[in-house]
UniProtKB/Swiss-Prot annotation:
The active site is at residues 81, 175, 177. It comes from the Bacteria. The keyword ATP-binding applies. This is GMP synthase [glutamine-hydrolyzing]. The keyword Iron does not apply. InterPro entries: Class_I_gatase-like (IPR029062), GATASE (IPR017926), GMP_synth_C (IPR001674), GMP_synth_GATase (IPR004739), GMP_synthase (IPR022955), GMPS_ATP_PPase_dom (IPR025777), NAD/GMP_synthase (IPR022310), Rossmann-like_a/b/a_fold (IPR014729). It comes from Nitrosomonas europaea (strain ATCC 19718 / CIP 103999 / KCTC 2705 / NBRC 14298). Catalyzes the synthesis of GMP from XMP. Residues 202-394 form the GMPS ATP-PPase domain. Homodimer. PANTHER family: GMP SYNTHASE [GLUTAMINE-HYDROLYZING], GMP SYNTHASE-RELATED. Gene3D superfamilies: 3.30.300.10, 3.40.50.880, HUPs. ATP binds at residues 229-235.
Amino acid sequence: MHSAILILDFGSQYTRLIARRIRETNVYCELHPFDVSPQFIREFAPIGIILSGGPASTFTEDAPRVPQIVFELGVPVLGICYGMQAMAAQLGGEVEDAQTREFGYAELLTAPCKLFHGIQDRINSDGKPALDVWMSHGDRVNKLPPGFTAIASNAATPFAAMADETRNFYGVQFHPEVTHTRQGKAILDHFVHDICSAGYDWNMPDYVEEAIGRIRARVGNDKVVLGLSGGVDSSVAAALIHRAIGDQLVCVFVDNGLLRLNEAKQIMETFSRNLAVNVIYIDAGRQFLEQLKGITDPEQKRRTIGREFVEIFQQEAEKIENAKWLAQGTIYPDVIESAGSHTKKAGVIKSHHNVGGLPETLHLKLLEPLRELFKDEVRELGLALGLPHDLVFRHPFPGPGLGVRILGEVKYEYTELLRQADAIFIEELRNAGWYEKTSQAFAVFLPIKSVGVMGDNRSYEYVVALRAVQTEDFMTAHWAELPYTLLSRISNRIINEIRGINRVVYDISGKPPATIEWE
């Protein structure tokens, strides 16, 4: 059993980053809504608790409150932004609407304390240690609770961080979880290892053996059915479950006709031939295209593709004798987004295709071996299981596939043109060493024609857009500044090698305001 940090979520857009940063220090943690029950917290038995930021103000009537048990367990507590303000307000301090709001970079001067011990960005002209941090707050603590002292300040925020070192209670008004706070990771590392006394016991080699043991204990001699998509999550889940129970795993691979070039062949070679996994291949491309006829709305396309997949998968799963379990590649961000922790006020932010749905219709028990892992941990696990590097580190691909990379109605002709254009784009990125420098790259088919000149003749053909972004967390993204020579080479190849496309454009929109996918 791992020692664990509990993170209580008060609604900050950065909360997930806290969990990722803690995991990066080789410490296990879980993220749960702020209103979990005292019994849940007691049974979780955390060695430390982190209170996240959030959009609320502590002095409003319906302000979220920290469960009182947090301050009674006798474990270290770190409040971040709103978490610090809530801690201050509930322990006898005061919070006010700040006259000077801080959004962005700020410099803080720090005082000696365990949390900041040995951590600084520089020594200022007065000989005091300074930190460059990222602020995002409109309220501030204006009176410290009894027993607390100020451990960081600037002109706008006299109590930018506070500490009661007797109880190991700390609060920081800034966000140590974001990369903009240069020493943020070191501060969180100090908190979990030096203050909470956490060990370094969260790593993938150990996790593989633990996960295999858990799968065997749960499944016994039953068969497990898994919908294999070829994406990183389902692929790693399949490899892990197969390592645990061998031929008891049966994978169903539904080729919906909306995959990338040669993707179906690669998936079958990797799993059926190389890993000896039992894979049932269903060629359903025509069926999906028939159902998509005349549909132009992106959400309706998603629903149609999802519904068709469920029907086909269910038909095949029902043929498998002694199948008692449905395995899914659900990962921790899916669980967080769907408010997967069962708490009294946990609202669903959005439904996710991997959380819920199929088990009820199939009357199967659910097996989610990656449920507690972040994406980077899933990739690390995939390598530990021997999956090919190219598969483990391939860019994200949407569940509906090319169906949402073709604007408007999906037609067979469009899928063929897009497949070829996308393959050229990715091949050239790999050849130029840019594939792993980008977080996601793909082509988009625009169902409009433009005039061109091919030799001495006028052409009137389709347009393809290229999209490549760089991001750490996919919450925000910057368009990749690919070299002009590379873009020129890609454009020339697409236009010269693919009959039907005579214009290529490059998308230079960031997220926000644009999303990464076009639909």
